[in-house]
């Protein structure tokens, strides 16, 4: 019969083995996949670009030109690690040309108005960036069978502030 400490050690060992297997599965899944990331120069987009690059994915990013030296995209030196195109996802013709030529099998869509205070100052522009950019991606990709997945990533700012410290659930307002 196992003692408490032996059982705990055994569980930790099993979890480490499962974690290692999962990491291998994820790395193998993304290796050599052609992946398009919109919003690649933003905080989340830069991290995603970095990790997919380390997994040997073929990554192309779309984003705004970073204008600050403390920008994560610049700090990670991603311009030398992934392909990058600087344009707005509202520019449907450029987006279509890129998708048609690069032929991504997976698209991570992160492009959005990143600054909340700017969204209050420029609500129409924010809606155009967030909604029309997403519509362009979805509309264009319905024509291409090589696109297998589109993952739209947002933030907690899509939820009404409920002043809770518990975080949000999918069915929150």
Give the location of each predicted region:
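N-terminal Rossmann-like NAD(P)+-binding domain of SDR-like oxidoreductases, especially those catalyzing
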Residues: 1-173
